[in-house]
Amino acid sequence: MSNRVSTGKMAMAPQESVQPAVLYKLVLFALLMAVVPIGTYFSTLNYLWDGASRCGFPSGLCSTTFAAISAIAAANLILVGYVVVAFREDAASRTGPLPEKKTS
């Protein structure tokens, strides 16, 4: 048999370590990563690169390639934005309010 004795105490729930603002930013950027590149692809395909035949290939191939490059650029901009926001948040948490010196 086991020598362990139950104390009858329930385990304490872990304290909330995830800040709501961090979770909000993560969800926001995840949604942006899902929506913006797809929207960029179809909007540039239909409005910006419509009928682009400057590359020497059939116009459909050129416009889809340019639209895909536009979507990749949009996704990378969102990713860079997330990294910038994360670094700013980290720097702000490190430079919190300084403790006041007590004068006696």
UniProtKB/Swiss-Prot annotation:
Q: Which UniProt keywords apply?
A: Cytoplasmic vesicle, Endoplasmic reticulum, Membrane, Transmembrane, Transmembrane helix
Q: What does this protein do?
A: Required for the assembly of the V0 complex of the vacuolar ATPase (V-ATPase) in the endoplasmic reticulum.
Family to which the UniProt record says this protein belongs? Belongs to the VMA21 family.
Q: Which residues form a coiled coil?
A: none
CC annotations in GO: endoplasmic reticulum membrane; endoplasmic reticulum-Golgi intermediate compartment membrane; ER to Golgi transport vesicle membrane
Query: PANTHER family attached here?
Result: VACUOLAR ATPASE ASSEMBLY INTEGRAL MEMBRANE PROTEIN VMA21
Query: Which residues does the entry place in the Lumenal compartment?
Result: 43-65
Reply yes or no: does the keyword rRNA processing apply: no
Compartment(s) where it occurs, according to its Swiss-Prot or TrEMBL record: Endoplasmic reticulum membrane; Endoplasmic reticulum-Golgi intermediate compartment membrane; Cytoplasmic vesicle, COPII-coated vesicle membrane
Kindly provide the name given to this protein in its UniProt entry: Vacuolar ATPase assembly integral membrane protein VMA21
The record's Gene Ontology biological-process terms are:
vacuolar proton-transporting V-type ATPase complex assembly
Q: Which organism was this protein described from?
A: Cryptococcus neoformans var. neoformans serotype D (strain B-3501A) (Filobasidiella neoformans)
Q: What is the lineage of its organism?
A: Eukaryota, Fungi, Dikarya, Basidiomycota, Agaricomycotina
